[in-house]
Swiss-Prot record:
Keyword entries, A-Z: Mitochondrion, Ribonucleoprotein, Ribosomal protein
Its job: Putative component of the large subunit of mitochondrial ribosome.
Protein name: Putative large ribosomal subunit protein YmL35
Domain of life: Eukaryota
Source organism (scientific name): Saccharomyces cerevisiae (Baker's yeast)
First-listed, main subcellular location of the protein, grouped into a coarse class: mitochondrion
Lineage: Eukaryota, Fungi, Dikarya, Ascomycota, Saccharomycotina
Cellular compartments annotated: Mitochondrion
Record bears the keyword Ribosomal protein: yes
GO CC terms, sorted: mitochondrion; ribonucleoprotein complex; ribosome
The UniProt record lists the keyword rRNA-binding: no
Length: 17
């Protein structure tokens, strides 16, 4: 979960954060 650079089914993405 890196802002918008990492999108994995097991790692939810939090924009902005």
């Amino acid at each position: 979960g890196n802002a918008t650079s990492e999108r994995l089914p097991t790692d939810p993405v939090y924009p902005x954060v």
